[in-house]
Amino acid sequence: MTSDSANQAPASVAYPKNIKSFVKRAGRTTTGQAKAFEVWGPQFLLKYAPETLNMVKAFGMNGQDATIGPVIFEIGFGMGEATAHIAKVRPSDFFLCCEVHEPGVGALLKRIGEQDIHNIRILQHDAVEVIDNMLPLASLDGVHISFQTLGTSHVTTNADLFKHL
């Protein structure tokens, strides 16, 4: 196998280029963020599973006729300040948020709990895998991409990411 063929995906793959929607950053989880994982994690953190996500159940709506409002998929919310703000001012929208940075997830969980926000759910997982494996077709009403995109290669990554949607 040559080095050229090692970088090529099989022809049967829908998205032949491997795309990562994140870069793991160094950082420490504070005591408050760790406590937020314990206290609010069970209610607001969703576990990644390679199966279609039931949005109604994910957002805690019960009953046969339960529905939810518009679903916004947010990729890379950082420390969650903007996410918490927009979710609070748009209470009829539902925010499904992906972030891999543990301190950021903890910070958003802390904000959710302290500000009594109920329309956010968090997946601490790669957004590309979530898009490919968990999101039902036509289930999103909007997408926010909030991670830092400096340089040409990141612009290309964003374009490739949108191909998944």
What are these regions (language model features)?
Residues 133-142:
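A short acidic, Gly/Pro-enriched loop at the edge of an enzyme's catalytic core
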Residues 93-94, 138, 150:
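Secondary-structure boundary/capping positions in well-ordered alpha/beta enzyme cores
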Residues 151-165:
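A short, conserved alpha-helix within the catalytic core of class I
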Residues 109-110, 135-136, 156-158:
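Short amphipathic alpha-helical segments
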Residues 146:
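Residues lining the SAM
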